[in-house]
Amino acid sequence: MSYCENESYTKLKNKIIMKNAKYSINANLVYKNGYSGKNVNIAVLDTGVFKHKQLDGCIKHFMDFVGGKETCYDDNGHGTHVCGILSAADIGMAPGAGLYVFKVLDYLGMGQTSDSIRALKYIKENCVRLNI
């Protein structure tokens, strides 16, 4: 190998509160028009996800590329917020959509590009099996 680029990092810019999600993204229009996330699966690369009553039955798969844990967790909150925007029962854009969550950012919202690349590679290699 003649050249290898240095590792780069990603960092989240701000924090958002989950209770504001429905109105900040106009999700009420989704419900008004009868849309849902039924039969939809979404891959989320973020800080992880907490189990939450609004996400009951939505979290189909969790993989931790930061700490190697096997159970769902989110030590920052951003990933859970994103998952809520996507598929939460009362506030999501695609309520009930299946979530395949890949933790690539740490408690500070920072992550190595290589972790994101590993997650994307895993998704590509397993998309048919995971149905995403």
Spans of features found by a protein language model:
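Predominant activation on well-ordered alpha-helical scaffold segments within soluble catalytic domains
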Residues: 83, 117-124
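Short acidic, glycine-rich surface-loop motifs adjacent to enzyme active sites
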Residues: 5-9, 121-132
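Subtilisin-like serine protease catalytic core
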Residues: 29-43, 49-61, 69-114, 130-131
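Protease zymogen maturation seam
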Residues: 1-41, 53-54
